[in-house]
Amino acid sequence: MNKMTLTHLSNITAYDDISCPSKAIKRGMHCPLFGCILLTKYIADMPFLIVGTDECGFYGREIIKVVADDPLSYPVYTYSIEENDVVYGCGEDLLKSLQQIQKTESPTAICVVSTCVPELIGEDISGVVFEASRQLKLPIIHCPAHNFGENSHVDGQSDLMAALSELMRPCERIEKSVNLLCGRGEADEDSEITRWLVQNGVNICVRFPGRCTVADIQNAPSASLNIVTDPIGLKLAKKMLEQYKTPYILFGKYADPKRILSCYKSLQRHLKLAEDPFWEKRAIQLQALWEQIGYCVEGKQYIYSNSPLISIDMILMLERYGAKPLAYYVISKNDFERELFPEFKHSNVDPLVALLADFGISERLLEIYKPDFFIGRLSENLIRKTEISCLDFEGVSIGQGFDALQAVLEYIMKALGGQT
């Protein structure tokens, strides 16, 4: 790939103009089906049915083998579309499959995940699901997961969470209560935000993705506020705002301590809590840690692929301390990045920007630019070949709020030779 096939930030007008350099439209790193399957274990009484080709079913089973501690505990079934289904439709047989799942599992609800082929042949999966739900007298939701229209597994997680709104029902609002819409593996009761909410007597109705039941999801509209800590929860938050008038706050993994402090102040206002001076002190501590980072990164150039923090905010903070981004890959577009894009445009950096299509771009750009360090994942062979400092954040326990920022900054200090 020639560097001219990528676009500089200065030539991009709006966030949504960021495009993929691949000739394949929106070719993502992982199928959105991957993202859907990652979330299947979190709802105890809702099995999943994948509707697609044999390959989709095989792909799903292989993912479960990799990510599950106990693969047999994943309630995932597959319906493989055959030639007759393409010609005559699969509605009747799909209904039989759902009946069998109901008989076997006695579930509270079922989720149907449809992949590319049903969409391409015009199969009305939503209609089949609606009719099956009526006949079986069982809540059945539908989540499309077609890779030709979605960029990555992140989109799959987002779409599945949004589909959960189909299970919800109007509830009496509970004052001083929240739902936590977070990233996978972040619903820990010991997370920074959770600890603070509990200490202040705030009731947490649902943490998702987190262990819960269909009943928990159904009653989620009883919360007075949704706290969105990860982009995958944003579609669901918007649906709940539209359907149940539940407000939401974005509390992303910011790199700027002032933004994290602002999030806490916003929560205090919405929940009518007294301001906690502890967060002011934490912001000062993390700002001091950034000052130390500045000595490690000043005058250095880097390529940014991904990190646990919000990408644009991370780049803006590194720029403040003298580091220059040569290229920046967007993994999956989201409102956390979108809200910071105007500030990004008016900054003093002008990296190449692209929607990430494949990791081969990294190798070619490393050969061209020879940066001082790389933020994201690289193969071990490429790291040895280029002798580049690679900040992949493997093994770093990432929480939320200031805890997440501290973990990332301490990792950077160690990786680039500083002292924490």
Write out the residue ranges for each language-model feature.
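An N-terminal assembly and electron-transfer interface module characteristic of large anaerobic redox
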Residues: 1-420
